[in-house]
Amino acid sequence: MIGNSVYISPSPSPSDHSLSPNPNLCISAMEEQLVVDDDDDDLAPPPIPDLDIDLEDDDDACCHGLLHIAPNHEEETGCDENAFANEKCLMAPPPTPGMEFESYDDAYSFYNSYARELGFAIRVKSSWTKRNSKEKRGAVLCCNCQGFKLLKDAHSRRKETRTGCQAMIRLRLIHFDRWKVDQVKLDHNHSFDPQRAHNSKSHKKSSSSASPATKTNPEPPPHVQVRTIKLYRTLALDTPPALGTSLSSGETSDLSLDHFQSSRRLELRGGFRALQDFFFQIQLSSPNFLYLMDLADDGSLRNVFWIDARARAAYSHFGDVLLFDTTCLSNAYELPLVAFVGINHHGDTILLGCGLLADQSFETYVWLFRAWLTCMLGRPPQIFITEQCKAMRTAVSEVFPRAHHRLSLTHVLHNICQSVVQLQDSDLFPMALNRVVYGCLKVEEFETAWEEMIIRFGMTNNETIRDMFQDRELWAPVYLKDTFLAGALTFPLGNVAAPFIFSGYVHENTSLREFLEGYESFLDKKYTREALCDSESLKLIPKLKTTHPYESQMAKVFTMEIFRRFQDEVSAMSSCFGVTQVHSNGSASSYVVKEREGDKVRDFEVIYETSAAAQVRCFCVCGGFSFNGYQCRHVLLLLSHNGLQEVPPQYILQRWRKDVKRLYVAEFGSGRVDIMNPDQWYEHLHRRAMQVVEQGMRSKEHCRAAWEAFRECANKVQFVTEKPS
């Protein structure tokens, strides 16, 4: 058999373990017969890579993906021209509860391939069949070190290799033609011997079963270790609760209609081969590049997602705020491109993954979000900002239940202005709208001003404005003062001239081929700009505008761009005055700070609190720290008024510092890696090594330096091995 078919039910993140069921395998003794196949095969299994994503098992209420794996130098067959053949990607994730296979052989081959690549062997611990038909109904596949051997004649006794290891998967037949993983245990209790594992019965059997055609195929170069990953999907059987609701004119997709159009395919217009070549070339230079494809039942391509190693590394450091840009879909561009976007320590955008989507259905968004989450090792963002779309909103709550979903303020204001047809030639309404949205400091003030505005302009029956107001807690700044946004709320998403991160590269008529040809150039310019900003922040001394100690303090800490923004707040302290304490309750006090805005003077309430440990906490009604990540002018004036010569350290965010560590990997002492746990060593060392590999690909000099470093490292490790104990 060539390749394996794996049916995966995606899941919430590891932080959502309470949502993940633990299915139990139920066997009726009246209908099934237990068969024990305790093959005797000696060997020892390996460490498990740290890809611990507990996939939620919900056959009827979620959309699923079918992961197709084509082993190295084996040819994949059975796909039409819309499906990828011999594509290159990373190996499959570890087995998880909820995986489904088209046959028992596929399930066995998948687990055996997983074991072979990691370095252990498997055997059938037990299986059971129906009494009448002898049809196999279930099985348990275990690590070869499971259990203990019975003592036999001492003269013929072989070396004991079993350790009572509990690693296993439990399978059962469902729907007459599909096998499902009910239970998984990945932990081993013994040392590992990958070389011995490759000589085991299960792996020899797998190697000898390769087809003649496969054996005659030329093998890829030894330095290219690649595998194909393809995600298939079937239509969910149950309709989510939101499917029955209608959409307003301000929303951008038909949730109930698109959800059932499973036959729709991605129209690449001749760009399929270019996409295939693009993935292949990227993987030759970036081993940790990932892509996943969503194929319909007929093999046609529906959706594609890809992400490079740098993006995955950057997300581990800047994963607090994530934006999802669907400008191309919302405006019917020729290129159905979507992008996941983050914000780096310079306040600039970084690309955290791209996709090509066939439609804007709930099912499509769920597939995409789960594909992205899987590539990010199951770590969801804290804040997820999107445009307003009911299908997307439902998918976000399905895949990221713990994330705070917010709407792009720019997209909301754009939709509101577009809905007021009779006022589009006038600047009066946009000006009034901006005053209400940005000028109100308290909820009651905002709601009163909103009501007065819609009455003034005769919009009480405007459906879009009514729906936007119902969702006001997701986009209006007055409701978001307890949500850290890193300055992202006003980033342009949705109905704008071009996708903001690809501005200048993607236009309405940009083809897939044109986009792919400029993709690496775009990324190179982004990385080069970030490197220049890093260099500027580390080497240049910013020019100070005032003599205030806060400015000189942050000049040594913040990156150049963030410091310039903070510098504006320090300069604006001169327009603030009249600090007055209006209330005190123990350690907490309420102050009013006045600010002169043109000819007007406005009051800003600031809460000032000191703890027993003399730690200061401040909160301003303007919400400046939550929106921007550094303190506002009102708090700075109050801190100075109360005698603080430095900004408290809790208000100096690590994400804005010029000395932020760019290794993006866990340190041994960080608490995320247990030095005493061998299962985590592989993942930790692999990440470190891959970072050097990525840097080594930049130039000949980088490659030479990386090679020398690896050679020196290998010598040191060999010295430890040969060192007498």
UniProtKB/Swiss-Prot annotation:
Keywords: Metal-binding, Nucleus, Zinc, Zinc-finger. Induction: Up-regulated in hypocotyls by far-red light treatment. GO terms for molecular function: zinc ion binding. InterPro entries: FAR1_DNA_bnd_dom (IPR004330), FHY3/FAR1 (IPR031052), MULE_transposase_dom (IPR018289), Znf_PMZ (IPR006564), Znf_SWIM (IPR007527). A zinc finger (SWIM-type) spans 604-643. Residues 327-416 form the MULE domain. GO terms for cellular component: nucleus. It is found in: Nucleus. The keyword DNA damage does not apply. Expressed in hypocotyls, rosette and cauline leaves, inflorescences stems, flowers and siliques. Residues 109-193 form the FAR1 domain. Residues 14-23, 207-217 have a biased composition (Low complexity). Residues 1-24, 190-224 are annotated as: Disordered. Pfam families: FAR1, MULE, SWIM. The keyword Zinc-finger applies. GO terms for biological process: regulation of DNA-templated transcription. Belongs to the FHY3/FAR1 family. Putative transcription activator involved in regulating light control of development. May have a role in controlling flowering time. PANTHER family: PROTEIN FAR1-RELATED SEQUENCE 10-RELATED, PROTEIN FAR1-RELATED SEQUENCE 8. This is Protein FAR1-RELATED SEQUENCE 8. It comes from Arabidopsis thaliana. The gene is FRS8.
